[in-house]
């Protein structure tokens, strides 16, 4: 559900790309300079520490790691923004269920890997936003959140993944 809320916020921006602004002073300077509205999204880093990202535009090249996140985006009609999806555990039948429930949206996704991808494969898709579970942002998978941030790519770690938050409240 949190992923759905994040995507709704992104949709409300009405732009085509995302931007990273690392601190409050830089964010205020950008608002003053451009007059653009920013949307703050609270997420986590690789070490499960809270962090914020600020979006000025809708991500247009989203890389998705995990079937549940893919399903949420497809349910919101965002298949055309997804450049690739890495679905681990595809043998569980989750992919088949997604394929049957959202066939038109799934057709818009250029590449879906039934096995996990690595960082080099993710880089090849030139994403501007990566959504996944905390376990995807390790050196052995896609690399750390800071690695992507240094390259101008926003990341979103679902709070419900890999015990990032023990308990949560949706407001």
Predicted regions and their residues:
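Structured C-terminal subdomain patch of bacterial secreted/periplasmic proteins
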Residues: 17-20, 110, 117, 162, ...
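Extracytoplasmic substrate-binding proteins
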Residues: 129, 140-171
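Bacterial Sec-exported substrate-binding components of ABC uptake systems
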Residues: 1-72
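Predominantly a core beta-strand signature of beta-propeller blades
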Residues: 38, 108-109, 155
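A short, structured surface patch at a secondary-structure boundary
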Residues: 64-125, 129-137
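Extracellular/periplasmic catalytic domains that process cell-envelope and extracellular macromolecules
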Residues: 33, 54-58, 77, 123-124, ...
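Residues at the C-termini of beta-strands that transition into short coil/loop
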Residues: 45, 86-89, 159-160
């Amino acid at each position: 559900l949190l992923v759905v809320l994040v995507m709704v916020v992104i949709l409300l921006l009405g732009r085509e790309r995302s931007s990273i602004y690392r601190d409050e002073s830089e964010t205020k300077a950008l608002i003053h300079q451009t007059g653009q509205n920013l949307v703050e999204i609270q997420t986590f880093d690789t070490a499960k520490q809270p962090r914020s990202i600020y979006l000025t535009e809708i991500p247009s090249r989203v890389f998705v790691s995990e079937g549940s996140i893919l399903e949420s985006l497809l349910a919101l009609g965002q298949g055309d923004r997804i450049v690739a999806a890495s679905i681990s555990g595809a043998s569980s039948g989750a992919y088949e269920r997604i394929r049957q429930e959202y066939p038109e949206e799934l057709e818009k996704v250029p590449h879906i890997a039934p096995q996990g991808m690595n960082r080099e494969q993710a880089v090849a898709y030139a994403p501007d936003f990566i959504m996944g579970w905390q376990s995807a942002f390790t050196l052995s998978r896609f690399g750390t959140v800071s690695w992507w941030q240094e390259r101008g790519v926003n990341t979103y770690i679902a709070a419900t993944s890999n015990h990032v938050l023990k308990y949560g409240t949706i407001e």
